[in-house]
Amino acid sequence: MAIRVLIMAGGTGGHIFPALAVADRLRAWGVEVVWMGTRHGLEAELVPKAGYPIEWISIGGLRGKGLTHWLRAPFKLLLALSQALRALRRWQPAVVLGLGGFVSGPGGLGAWLLRRPLLIHEQNAIVGTANRLLAPLAGRVMEAFPGTFPPARKAEWTGNPVRESIEQLSESRARLQARQGCFHLLVLGGSQGARILNETVPQALALLPTKVRPQVWHQCGSRQWEGAVVAYRAAGVEARLVPFIDDMAAAYAWADLVVCRAGALTVAELMAAGIGALLVPFPLAIDDHQRANADYLVVAGAALLLPEKELSPSRLAQEIERLGADYSTFISMAQAARQLHRVGAAQRVAERCLEVASG
C-alpha cells in the first residue's frame, strides 16, 4: 500500500505553488498525495488541474479583519476543525504537511488531535500566524529563509520549493550575455495582480526615450487586465499584457530584469532563476513580511528596494534607465540572486515527509 501524505496549502500562489512542487516530487516517488484547501482560494483551480484529490474546509484569514469577523471566528474555526477531522479520518494520512496560510490552522490542529505526524514549512522571512501556532505541535519545522524561526524550534533551512523547470534554467551569465537588442523587462503582479504596478509601469516607460525603452512582458492579473490595457494604451507604450503566466520558466529565461512585489514565491523564483529585480513590497502584507523577503535579496546585491510610498513614474523610470545603461549590472544582480538559492528544496521537503512516514 502506497504511503499517503496530506498537504495543506491554500489562498495565494505563494503557498500553493511551493506545495505543488513538493506534491509533484512525492507523486513521482509513488506517494499518494491528498490536498486540503478552500473553495475560494487559488487551489480550487490549480490543485484539481494538477490531478490531486482535494478536501474542502470553510476557513478564511482573521488578521486585518473587522470586529464582525472576529466575533464569528470561534464558530468558523470549530466548523473548519470538524471538516478537517472528517477529512483526516477518511484518508488516514501517514504524514500531514502544512505550508502556511489559514487552511493549515484547522488541519494542523486536527492532525495533532488525531496523533498524525505533522510537518510545517514557512515560505516567508517572517513566520505567519498559522505556522507560529502550529510550530509547538509539529514534529518537523522547516523554513525557506535561514533564521526565520527562533532557535528553540530547531527549524531546518530547506529553501523554498519551486518548479523544477525554473531550477533547470541555464546559468545567469550565459543566458544574459547572449542577449541582443533592447533589454527585456518582466513585470509581475503576483497571482492577484498589483494595480499600482499596472498603473505606474506604463507611465514610467512613457518617460523614457524610445531608443532606451525595454521590451515589456507584463503579468497583470485576470481582474485587472482590462485596466492595464487601458493604462498602456493611454501611455502610448507597447507591451505584451497577460492576465497570468503558466510557464514561468520561459518568462524568467526571457527576462533581463523583473519589476515585482516581494511575495515568497516570487522571491524564491528570482533566486532559482538567477535574475535581478526592482522589488516593490506590498505595504499591507501581514507583519510587513514582503519587506523582510525583499531585504534578503537587497542585502546580497540581487535586487533594489523601491517602497510603494516612494514609487512614482519618474522614480521608476530613473531606476530602469540607470540599470539598463550598464548590462553588467543585470549580470551581477542575477549571479547574486542565483547564489542565494538553496537547490533542491522540493526534494528536501518531500524527503522529510518520507522520513517521518517511515520512521
From Swiss-Prot:
Pfam families: Glyco_tran_28_C, Glyco_transf_28. Pathway: Cell wall biogenesis; peptidoglycan biosynthesis. The keyword Disulfide bond does not apply. Its main location: membrane. GO terms for molecular function: UDP-N-acetyl-D-glucosamine:N-acetylmuramoyl-L-alanyl-D-glutamyl-meso-2,6-diaminopimelyl-D-alanyl-D-alanine-diphosphoundecaprenol 4-beta-N-acetylglucosaminlytransferase activity; undecaprenyldiphospho-muramoylpentapeptide beta-N-acetylglucosaminyltransferase activity. Belongs to the glycosyltransferase 28 family. MurG subfamily. GO terms for biological process: carbohydrate metabolic process; cell division; cell wall organization; lipid glycosylation; peptidoglycan biosynthetic process; regulation of cell shape. This is UDP-N-acetylglucosamine--N-acetylmuramyl-(pentapeptide) pyrophosphoryl-undecaprenol N-acetylglucosamine transferase. InterPro entries: GlcNAc_MurG (IPR006009), Glyco_trans_28_C (IPR007235), GlycoTrans_28_N (IPR004276). The gene is murG. It is a peripheral membrane protein. It is found in: Cell inner membrane. The lineage of its organism: Bacteria, Pseudomonadati, Pseudomonadota, Gammaproteobacteria, Chromatiales. UDP-N-acetyl-alpha-D-glucosamine binds at T12, G13, G14, N124, R163, S191, I245, A264, L265, T266, V267, A268, E269, Q290.
